Every structure is written in C-alpha cells, then in structure tokens.
Amino acid sequence: MKKILVRVLLVLLVAALGFGGFVYYMVHNSTSQIYSYNKKTNKSSDDKTASKKSVAYLLLGTDTGELGRSYKGRTDTMIVVVVNPKSKTTTMVSVPRDTKVDFDDVTIKINAAYSYGSSDTAMSAVEKLLNIKLDGYLLVNMKGLEQLVDAVGGVTVTSPLSFNYEGKSFVKGQSYDLSGSDALKFSRMRYDDPQGDYGRQMRQQQILTAVIGKLKSNPTTVLSQKFLDAVGKNVRTDVSLGSVKNLATEYRDAGNTIKSDQLHGTGQNIDGQDYEVMSDSEITRVHNLLQNAIDAK
C-alpha cells in the first residue's frame, strides 16, 4: 500500500505478527535510520503496547522515489490500522485520497495534508475526520513496494476483476504469483476499475495482506539484508523501538485475523475540484467500526 509496510511490516508485522526479541535486535540498525521521535505519539504507543492494549496507526503511502528527497508529494494511500492483541485481530480501513476536509480554514483533499505539513499533519487530518486517536504513523514510499515484495520472494493474489495495466494482464478470479513489479501494477490501476479509487484501495489491501502472510509463514525473511535495505530506503515512522519490541513479543496473534473496510463517499465537483464527500452517517459508521476494533475483547 503504497509502500506497503515493513516497518510497517516491522511494526505492523512485527506488530501484528511479531517475530520476537531476536528480530528486534537484528533490525535495530535499520529501524534507527527510519525512526523519527514524536513526544506525543511515542508516549501513547509505548504506554499502550507496554500494557498490551490496542493500538491504532496510520499507514501513509507517497510516490516520490526514495524518502528523504526535498519533494514530498501527496499521500495517495492512507490506511488506519488497528492492532488488537486481545481479540487477536488487525483491522484496516482505507481513507480515499480525494476525501474533502477543511485544513486551516481551506478546503483540500485529505491526501494534500501531508504535503502542506508533515506526517503529523496527515495524522491530525485523519483523527479530526474520524474522531479517533492515532498512536503513530508509518510512511512508505510507493516504489518501495516493488522492493519489499521482491524481498519476501513475491506474493500470491486473486484478481477481483479483469484488467490490463502497463503490459500486465489480470483475469477476474484467477490467482497470480506476483513479483514486486507486477504487484505494483496490480495495486496502482485505478481508471479501469468500475469502483475507481475504492477498487484500488482493496487491491492495495490484498497486497498488504499477502505480504503479511508471507512474512508470517517465513519470519526469517525479515532478517535478510535485502529486506532490511528495502526498509531503510523506503520507510519512515514515529513508532519507537520500545513499541516495536512490545509489539513483536505480545501482539503476534493479532495477525491471525485481518479485516478490511473503506470509507465511502459521494463524488462532488466543488469549485472545479473533484472531491469525495463523506456523509455524517458514513463517518459515524467508520468511527464506530474502528472504536469497536479498539475496544474488542
């Protein structure tokens, strides 16, 4: 998902699936270069993971080449992920990139919040929209998806529709073993999908779930230099190493069940811009879904 995890899959894999203190030790060098201190979220995430409580992170996907460049771009992928160790469930909810929100008294698409400020700004926009509390973010570079999928040896997915994209063909109902390059094609196509960006979000979640499954079946993959290099170049997070350690040792069963959903809006053109406008009832539905995922026992 655009950058599909890895620290995301090393927080949300180590988070949701966990590989123990050994992995925590082995990935220290990689995670230290992708970590950004945030006083507010660090305390929240550290306190909750130490107490084995549910945590909610925001996955952000940008598409600007390796992270660290001056041009930040927009976060066309935004996914709220709740990891609950008690219910042994991970819940993912995608937020459409064109979602209409107010930012400093100006109407913008939610994917622009990151470019106007930072990952913290994007996180604040999602918190305000859904009336939830997030415990940290994981920012992944879209191009990194290709490297990450290759690092785990490829993934297998079943196509929900038939389409062609950049020379690769997919047939509805057929399963495909995808390389990183093909996984990127599978997750990027939008205009030929009858569901538009919603369809793309679901395919992104398919790739994410497949990567998680691959790492869970072969956790030693996370120790490979290829995998760690992909993480270092393409992932940034404010989730501390302390939280990662807690997630790795106490949250592994949360990957047993992965649930996916989306925030659905209505397309509207406002002042020449196309937005997805969310109804109060839809925002309430998703808020309740996420809150129930957090509170589930």
Name what the model sees in each region:
Residues 2-10, 15-297:
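Non-catalytic, solvent-exposed segments at the cell envelope interface
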